[in-house]
Swiss-Prot record:
Homodimer. It is an enzyme of class 3 (hydrolase). HAMAP family: Nudix_NudC. A motif (Nudix box) lies at residues 175-196. This is NAD-capped RNA hydrolase NudC. A divalent metal cation 1 binds at residues 174, 194, 235. A divalent metal cation 2 binds at residue 190.
Length: 278
């Protein structure tokens, strides 16, 4: 029997009473010793600087709402925590919920006004969209498709590090899909741009929402076909082949980047394939 999901998205009526809520400000999400979900009625009594409110889904069967604040404030007995920390430390179902909430919050902040005429927009009831009456324009949450690929050569994997990475960490190659190209075209282009390597036998491995701030990661495995590694200036700090028995520090366990690496290690060793989170 398939275990029911703890978190499911939905567009809920913000005029309804009750439910739970998460609070997002410029310092992350509000939390206390019980977590990031609070009784909605209790939050309303705090008179927080709410910029917008959104009904976002159900967690363990309970309706959940999102309060987007104009700025973070001090709440007695609570603290603020960034989304990445929830991914690294907390319940993955909670991270999925907060990842969705973070993307809704980003969309709500960026589309308070119409990009065509500058007039204020309004939420459309029953739909995840903002609306400009003047231009008859609907504004939906942004999703940015991107690819991530593990390139392999026998018992070696090609890993690279960006100047933005934490010290010492290496990961698979990644990049955003350009208008007019397929995900597969993107993989070939990005690998060539970033390390000047040709690839073959592309295999789709799965996808993962990456809410930093609104990426949809499409994961691939590819085999090395030729070329010497030449890191892209300003984008790739270092790139090299690593033997599977001598790997550097890797991305977080819950990331698709780590999954691609672990899946290949399992394939080479004959171990069971890992499960892609989320």
């Amino acid at each position: 029997m398939t275990r029911p999901q703890r978190w499911t998205t939905a567009v809920l009526d913000v005029e309804a009473d009750g439910g739970l809520a998460v609070v997002q400000g410029d310092q992350g999400f509000l939390l206390d010793s019980n977590g990031a979900l609070f009784p909605r009625s209790w939050l309303r009594a705090l008179d927080l600087p709410v910029q917008s409110e959104h009904g976002i889904g159900y967690f363990d069967g309970e309706p959940v709402y999102l309060l987007v604040l104009q700025h973070s404030v001090v709440v007695e007995g609570c603290a603020w925590q960034g989304l990445r920390q929830f991914m690294l430390e907390g319940d993955f179902a909670v991270f999925q919920m907060l990842g969705y909430a973070a993307q809704v919050a980003t969309w709500a902040r960026e589309h308070r006004f119409c990009g065509a005429c500058g007039r204020a927009t309004v939420q459309i009831a029953g739909e995840r969209a903002m609306y400009c009456e003047h231009d008859n324009l609907r504004l939906y949450p942004r999703i940015s498709p991107s690819m991530i690929v593990l390139v392999t050569r026998g018992d070696e994997v090609l890993l690279a590090r960006s100047p933005r990475f934490v010290s010492g960490m290496y990961s698979a190659l990644a990049g955003f899909v350009e208008p007019g190209e397929s995900a597969e075209d993107c993989v070939h282009r990005e690998v060539m741009e970033e390390v000047q390597v040709r690839i073959k036998n592309l295999k789709y491995m799965g996808s993962q929402c990456w809410p930093f701030p609104h990426s949809m990661m499409l994961g691939f495995h590819a085999q090395y076909a030729g070329g010497d590694i030449v890191p892209q200036v300003d984008e790739i700090e270092d790139a090299r082949w690593f033997h599977i028995d001598d790997l550097p520090p890797l991305p977080a366990n819950r990331s698709i980047a780590r999954y691609l690496i672990e899946a290949y290690l399992a394939e080479r060793s004959g171990a069971p394939e890992p499960v892609l989170p989320g």
